[in-house]
């Protein structure tokens, strides 16, 4: 039995030393120290020994078990340390490499178009006027010659908050508020009103329940239709190119009389007819007209002394036409791949 223990110890220590991974080491633990291992078998044979041999062989067996346990524990620590070092080596971050830079936003295409128009009108002596987006029914409709139950209200399905308040459907209420408080001793009214508006439209490629408008208003003495036409001509040439021609078509808006819609000669085909202009050679841009006398009177302005014109257009439509954007939803999805295409846009050609 003595020789058996010595052979077992030598063989086990050699295999433990050569173990290359934790699984192999655990298998050796089970092989030599497990319930079915040789050490267990040796301990069972102790009962066959004489009374003199039992203490000696029992002590030796315990020494072998302790030595093997110590060898396995030591080897386990070595293998665990090596495994940790390998993992750290594999997961090491090279801090000298450049990091992944976060995506940086740019000035939105709509913002650029709005600012371009604002700069143009400011250069013509206009001021920028703003008003609440949650508006009174009176300013959104009644002050603009749209009394309650007027059939023209059906043209603008609205988001009502209470019976008398709603999300504005146009920036025209800003014009009504401006006219109410204006002092003509300081000169005529010349304002543009940019801002968000809301209508109950189903979102699709050309419609959105929220969009932006820029409306213009000029009121003073001796303001004529010729002034309106000249202003719209400057707008068309500034935004779409000096070679643009304009066409005014009779239309109807409750707050202007007479009312016209402005078309520009197609910047894509030069008026020959193409997909953009639907073969007509003209593209509809905005609505406009001379301020209705009723609107002036409701704002406390003497319509026999003062006259004016107003116009309104959507920056989204301008942006889509000018930069060939085929879906209005692209302007609102915050996709940097889209917005970064326009970080260097300039006035003029597409």
UniProtKB/Swiss-Prot annotation:
Reactions it catalyzes: tRNA(Phe) + L-phenylalanine + ATP = L-phenylalanyl-tRNA(Phe) + AMP + diphosphate + H(+)
EC identifiers of the protein? 6.1.1.20
Assigned keywords, A-Z: Aminoacyl-tRNA synthetase, ATP-binding, Cytoplasm, Ligase, Magnesium, Metal-binding, Nucleotide-binding, Protein biosynthesis
A UniProt-annotated Pfam family? tRNA-synt_2d
User: Which residues constitute the signal peptide according to the record?
Assistant: none
Which positions does UniProt annotate for Mg(2+) binding? Answer: 257
Cofactor(s) the record lists: Mg(2+)
- Cofactor binding note: Binds 2 magnesium ions per tetramer.
UniProt keyword annotation of Transit peptide present: no
**Coiled-coil portions:** none
**What subcellular compartments does it reside in?**
Cytoplasm
The UniProt GO MF terms for this protein read: ATP binding; catalytic activity, acting on a protein; magnesium ion binding; phenylalanine-tRNA ligase activity; transferase activity; tRNA binding
Q: Which GO terms describe its biological process?
A: phenylalanyl-tRNA aminoacylation
Q: Which Gene3D superfamilies match?
A: Bira Bifunctional Protein, Domain 2
A single GO cellular-component term on record: cytoplasm
Recorded superkingdom: Bacteria
Q: What class of enzyme is it?
A: ligase
Record family assignment: Belongs to the class-II aminoacyl-tRNA synthetase family. Phe-tRNA synthetase alpha subunit type 1 subfamily.
Instruction: Outline the subunit composition.
Output: Tetramer of two alpha and two beta subunits.
What's the protein called, per UniProt?
Phenylalanine--tRNA ligase alpha subunit
What organism does this protein naturally occur in? Listeria welshimeri serovar 6b (strain ATCC 35897 / DSM 20650 / CCUG 15529 / CIP 8149 / NCTC 11857 / SLCC 5334 / V8)
